[in-house]
Amino acid sequence: MPNDPPPAYNSHPFNVVIFGESGVGKSSLVNLIAGSPLADTSPDAAACTFASRPYHVVLESCKAYCIWDTIGLNEPEISREDYLRAIKHAYKLIKDLERSGGIHLLLLCMRGRITKSVQQNYRLFVNVLCEKKIPLGVVITHLENEPSMDGWWIANERVFKSYGIATNGHACITTIPGIDGVFKDRKEESREKMRDLLLELTMPTSEGWRRESARTWFTDLMGGMMKMLPGRSRRPTNKELMEKLVRECGFSRKDATAIAGSIEVIREQPESESGSETSGSDDGGS
């Protein structure tokens, strides 16, 4: 169960953050990697961005992983309400990652189209949360009916490049449970692909990345996320931010005031060139 205490390790496990839209199969991917039903695969309509659950998995040679099943953005645009709901989950995720050794790997889980939501998730997790410091693996799900699952990547790799989505590895898979043995071979193939991808992208000498403090990391994340709000939307006020920071994150009013002010400063900074890397005009993929 996700709330059970983690196993004891001689050192921190590799922290792998899986992110993507709801319904793409993130929880099923956790179960595929683990080889057992660790994660609940039923949809959670009330899920908020950055809400996460850790699952502990040991692969070959006793290589330990903590897989963070993380809620990403489900809409092409972030709303003011989405932003405010995400605050407590973002702070908890960052605190958990900071004290457990940082992030070693990001996995973008998606279906076979690069939607606006996929682009926004890439920007939020790769550019903002991890400042492009972390390897990214892309996992394409729901490919069980393709003539060749790997053939999908051959046909669509150029689309990722055209959207500025830089990957360090990929896996074209299915996570479908299967009925009466249907897709059994493809699911076994998919499990091997995922384990190979994890082992390839987390070398024994890999060190987790994190900012100098959880507070700085959190402040920069929420400032970067604030910049992603549409220009026409009403932004959260300093008072609203402060109330959330005090009530849901446990900051003192003095600290909450300082953090809210820093978020506003970040929001006012000019957009860097990297901010438009995934600004394709149409959905991509087949």
Predicted regions and their residues:
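Conserved GTPase G-domain substructure that encodes guanine base recognition and part of the catalytic core
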Residues: 1-286
